[in-house]
């Protein structure tokens, strides 16, 4: 990263604070700090929670070239768990989201298989994009709610110790867990990057205390390191604990009460106020104009697509796409997961604000479909290294979309990570949502259960084809408009699903996903009992392809016993949610949809099996 020139007006401010000319070393440190602190300032735009710890956290693994190794994946999974442990949270669930180019690109299948293997029994999902990088993997971990314990305050003379584990995150985990029970341990902070001197600035700002660093101890370290502040006199105990776990522990400084940052051997002595001079700089200017590509989107031209009498062949092609294979895989995942991770890159590109809303909503649906009530969110944004006006505008819109949707769902965003990379051209958003499972309620699954059950559609099907799989296949483009996201309606549907499940009314639930209504019903059949079929009949004024393949956001399909219909309809009516009976579960092993589709369920299984083999090998 190119270091910018020290601004003249800030030079004057620093000179006024110091009562002297700042040294070259001090100016260099201040400039390194402002670049280092850029992540925090961008993150603050997205953060709504309070406190240093969070019940959900994120870590990232980015590769511009080549496939990832199992060791790489193990490190990113260990990193996200250790970050939670350091904040006082016990991790109990982990999820991975893997972005790669489409599977026909070299090395993609290797990365996909290794990611699935590394995840083991933990939930993992995949997104296939047309971006040029090799892979972008985000790990999310959730844990128990932080107990309301009074925070410990640092005092003059407390030791600053660097814990470093060159051999990997795994060695750090038991040490961090043990340090959590040490009363004399004040705070544990991850070392971000390799410049320990700038990381120490972050520590002083967190503690609002000064620090005196040993210049000879400011070694270059990797990201497998933490700074620990402990009570004066407990250094040997910490070293002994670290040695037991094969982690190096070095005393790098002391906390001081005078709120001054000093490094021995260097010409650096700065009051903490100097490091706040950049805080007034506007991170994202408010007067940036809308980029041309967002102002002039052409949308979908449906009259170019001919309407056949039967959609069987088109349906099977759609069901075999990467998007639908991943959706089916997620539908078949173990129920009751307390964490869900989502990304909708193409939607975010076409409409950053609405795409961000759709991303949050999808993460919420991911755990609601298992009967889990969403509570917390973590947000990850990858930004290009070069922050053009276009990128800044898109980030601002993403932040607005995340804010409106998390507010609507009453989620607390208490973990935000912003990363910068020279290998991407546009922001990438990833959202993880964690929640609390009701131990009394039965676990919900996606598959249809019993012959004769009614299939109900919650919400209004608008048949939107913008950003859809169908549009990509038929028009070689999946551009906007991005489907509307009705946050108020989604919140009501969430409560219906959770309440209906708690009282035993709902047998299965699946949210409309890639491929539209036809593909979603197919996923419920693939995940359902042997020999089952489905007879669907929907009256609609929209086009047949919109009805079958339109990807309306938030639409939910549930199955219920006949005796439960009246109670479910009453729940929906009281909440203002449209509820429509669209079909029944049959025993003939055939999926019919109006007179447009008639496919054996056995054929659906075969199509998915062949497509999974192409993607996963």
What function would you assign to each model-found segment?
Residues 2-29, 108-135, 176-303, 391, ...:
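Glycine-/charge-enriched secondary-structure boundary and capping motifs
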Residues 12, 19, 25-167, 213-219, ...:
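Glycine-rich phosphate/pyrophosphate-binding loop regions near the starts of catalytic domains
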Residues 73-76, 171, 196, 356-359, ...:
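Catalytic-loop motifs flanking and including active-site residues across diverse enzymes
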Residues 144-148, 169-175, 491-493:
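Active-site glycine-rich loop that binds ribose-phosphate moieties when present
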Residues 167, 171, 192, 489, ...:
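Short, contiguous, pocket-lining structural segments
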Residues 335-337, 358, 362-366, 376-378, ...:
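Charged, low-complexity, helix-prone segments enriched in Lys/Glu/Asp/Gln
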Residues 481, 485-487:
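Long, low-charge, small-residue-enriched segments that form tightly packed helices used
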């Amino acid at each position: 990263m190119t270091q910018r020139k020290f601004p003249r007006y800030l030079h004057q401010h620093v000179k006024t604070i110091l009562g002297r000319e700042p040294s070259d070393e001090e100016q260099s440190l201040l400039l390194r700090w402002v670049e280092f602190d850029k992540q925090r300032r961008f993150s603050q735009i997205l953060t709504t929670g309070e406190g240093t710890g969070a019940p959900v956290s994120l870590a990232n693994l980015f590769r511009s070239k080549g496939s990832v190794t199992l060791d790489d994946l193990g490190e990113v999974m260990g990193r996200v768990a250790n970050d939670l442990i350091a904040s006082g949270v016990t991790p109990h669930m982990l999820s991975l989201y893997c972005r790669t180019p489409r599977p026909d690109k070299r090395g993609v299948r290797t990365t996909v298989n290794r990611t699935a293997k590394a995840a083991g029994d933990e939930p993992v999902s995949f997104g296939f994009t047309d971006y040029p990088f090799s892979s972008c993997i985000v790990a999310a971990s959730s844990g128990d709610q932080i107990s309301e314990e009074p925070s410990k305050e640092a005092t003059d003379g407390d030791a600053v110790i660097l814990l470093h584990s060159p051999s990997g995150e795994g060695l750090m985990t038991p040490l961090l867990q043990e340090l959590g029970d040490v009363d004399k341990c004040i705070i544990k902070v991850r070392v971000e990057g390799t410049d320990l001197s700038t990381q120490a600035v972050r520590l002083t700002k967190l503690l609002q205390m000064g620090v005196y660093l040993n210049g000879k101890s400011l070694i270059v370290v990797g990201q497998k390191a933490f700074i620990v502040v402990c009570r004066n006199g407990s250094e040997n105990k910490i070293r002994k604990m670290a040695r037991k776990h094969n982690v190096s522990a070095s005393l790098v400084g002391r906390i001081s009460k005078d709120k001054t940052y000093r490094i021995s051997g260097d010409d650096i002595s700065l009051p903490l106020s100097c490091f706040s001079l950049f805080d007034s700089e506007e991170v994202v200017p408010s007067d940036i104009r809308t980029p041309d590509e967002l102002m002039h989107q052409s949308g979908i031209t449906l009259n170019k697509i001919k309407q056949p009498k039967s959609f069987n062949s088109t349906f099977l092609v759609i069901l075999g796409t990467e998007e639908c294979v991943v959706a089916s895989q997620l539908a078949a995942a173990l129920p009751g997961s307390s964490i869900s991770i989502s990304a909708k890159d193409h939607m975010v590109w076409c409409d950053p604000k609405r795409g961000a809303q759709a991303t949050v909503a999808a993460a919420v649906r991911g755990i609601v479909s298992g009967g889990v009530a969403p509570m917390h969110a973590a947000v990850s944004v990858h930004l290009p290294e070069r922050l053009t006006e276009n990128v800044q505008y898109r980030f601002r819109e993403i932040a607005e979309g995340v804010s409106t949707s998390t507010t609507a769902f009453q989620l607390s965003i208490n973990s935000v990570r912003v990363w910068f990379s020279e290998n991407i051209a546009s922001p990438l958003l990833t959202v993880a949502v964690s929640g609390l499972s009701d131990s009394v309620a039965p676990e919900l699954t996606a598959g249809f259960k019993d012959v004769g059950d009614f299939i109900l559609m919650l919400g209004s099907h608008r048949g939107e084809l913008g950003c859809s799989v169908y549009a990509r296949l038929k028009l070689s483009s999946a551009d906007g408009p991005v489907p509307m996201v009705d946050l108020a309606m989604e919140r009501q549907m969430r409560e219906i699903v959770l309440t209906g499940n708690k009282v035993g009314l709902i047998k299965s639930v699946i949210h409309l996903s890639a491929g539209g209504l036809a593909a979603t019903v197919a996923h419920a059949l693939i995940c359902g009992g042997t020999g089952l079929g489905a007879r669907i009949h929907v009256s609609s004024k929209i086009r047949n392809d919109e009805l079958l393949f339109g990807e309306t956001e938030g639409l939910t399909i549930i199955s219920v016993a006949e005796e439960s219909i009246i109670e479910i309809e009453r729940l929906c009516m009281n909440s203002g949610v449209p509820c429509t009976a669209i079909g029944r579960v049959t025993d003939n092993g055939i999926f019919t949809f109006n007179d447009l589709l008639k496919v054996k369920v056995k054929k659906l299984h075969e199509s998915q099996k062949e497509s999974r083999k192409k993607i996963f090998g």
